[in-house]
């Protein structure tokens, strides 16, 4: 590492003898990585700073060259993401379920509404569902319990919103059991849920709820349990300043427009508005999984 760092600060020595500017950059990167891993004596710090400057200049030159080469081409999302990954502007996010991984599934953060024929009929019921939501909230201000709760049967979850009603839930199906009191007073919700291919797994699913996020609340980045499902949000109350990031992509909720995403990919959500956000949240089978599987 020291030998590379002793090169001409401009990179000229390495440029001439080790493969040009790109070669120089690789040597400087190697020296910087070695210094970061094992440390470097104080007298080398000025040279390491100059090496960092050289690498930064080289990276900007490469980016300018690349962007000039592809300028004028159609703006294709996958090309844009690939370019951002290459330039270090974006991180690579893959499925990392915390409990169960099913192999061979596409690495997709979001799915589009148009891919599912049941989505449009459910979206058409948004008005009736919002009316039920408003009625419940007016009648029972404390109807929503904290989404993340401490259980005497499990270790306390490591979540800053544990037992905090700023992220609230009102369940219609929980752990595979219908919550009759809520289902009975919200027939539009139950009719809408009947349209979707919701998993039926004893003790686990169906799972469906109104998910409430109060103003100023941030759900920290995390991964879901499984990659065999998609999480669906039917947005009901959607103030400005609210968004959902899944992997490298961030989308906003729009009332009556479904969001479908793979929650085994790192995701987070926030409400930076002064009003409450509410979605109807449920899960469906991944469409790539065969019935036999």
Tell where the protein language model's regions lie, with residue ranges.
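Fe(II)/2-oxoglutarate oxygenase catalytic core
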Residues: 25, 29-209, 213-226, 239-242, ...
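Conserved metal-binding segment of the jelly-roll/cupin
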Residues: 252-266
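Short beta-strand His + acidic residue motifs that chelate non-heme Fe in jelly-roll/DSBH
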Residues: 219-222, 243-245, 261, 267-273
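A short beta-strand-loop-beta hairpin characteristic of the jelly-roll/cupin
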Residues: 236-255
């Amino acid at each position: 590492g020291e030998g590379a760092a002793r090169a001409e600060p401009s990179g000229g020595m390495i440029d001439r003898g080790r493969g040009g500017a790109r070669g120089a950059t690789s040597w400087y990167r190697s020296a910087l990585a070695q210094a970061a891993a094992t440390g470097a004596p104080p007298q080398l710090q000025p040279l390491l700073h100059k090496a960092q400057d050289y690498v930064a200049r080289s990276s900007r030159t490469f980016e300018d060259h690349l962007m000039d080469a592809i300028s004028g081409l159609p703006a294709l999302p996958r090309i844009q993401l690939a370019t951002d990954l290459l330039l270090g502007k974006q991180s690579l996010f893959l499925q990392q379920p915390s409990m169960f991984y099913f192999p061979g599934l596409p690495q997709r953060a979001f799915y589009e509404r148009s891919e599912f024929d049941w989505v449009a009929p459910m979206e058409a019921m948004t008005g009736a569902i919002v009316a039920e939501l408003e009625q419940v909230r007016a009648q029972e201000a404390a109807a929503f319990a904290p989404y993340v709760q401490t259980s005497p049967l499990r270790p306390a979850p490591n979540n800053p919103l544990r037992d905090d009603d700023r992220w609230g839930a009102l369940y219609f199906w929980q752990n595979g059991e219908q919550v009759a009191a809520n289902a009975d007073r919200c027939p539009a919700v139950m009719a809408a849920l009947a349209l979707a291919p919701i998993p039926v797994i004893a003790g686990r699913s169906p799972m469906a709820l109104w998910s409430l996020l109060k103003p100023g609340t941030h759900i920290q980045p995390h991964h879901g349990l499984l990659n065999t499902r998609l999480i669906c949000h039917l947005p009901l109350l959607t103030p400005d300043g609210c968004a959902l990031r899944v992997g490298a992509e961030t989308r906003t909720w729009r009332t009556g427009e479904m969001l479908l995403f793979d929650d085994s990919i790192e995701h987070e959500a926030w409400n930076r508005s002064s009003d409450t956000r509410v979605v109807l949240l449920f899960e469906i089978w991944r469409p790539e999984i065969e019935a036999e599987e």
